[in-house]
Amino acid sequence: MKHQLNSVKKFHEVYKLNYSEKPITDIGLDTIKLRFNLMDEENKEYFEAAKNNDLIEVADALGDMLYILCGTIIEHGMQNKIEEIFDEIQRSNTVSYTHLTLPTIYSV
């Protein structure tokens, strides 16, 4: 994940886009709206691509989603914490689902 985050950070540096070296929440309402709208657009593109069984467009949407997510992570200055955050979510999810069987999970 560090490679992807560093690549997007370089993009932000070249194009004078914001990023933070420390965790922050206040990135400005305009940036929050932009990040939300970019992710929303890619989610919709993914939905259409998956619904239409278009593997190339699914891959494109997933790649764009990852790129936008990396940009959002570095805007919030969480690039040095995101793997730890992910690991904690993984641990929590694993504990949450240990009592469920696969048929139970997929019947929700």
Task: Give residue ranges: language-model regions.
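N-terminal low-complexity segments that are often proline-rich with Ser/Thr-Pro
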Residues: 107-108
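Conserved small/polar residues in nucleotide/adenosyl-binding loops
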Residues: 98-104
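Extended low-complexity intrinsically disordered regions
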Residues: 1-52, 100
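An amphipathic alpha-helical micro-motif enriched in hydrophobic residues
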Residues: 39, 43, 55-83, 89
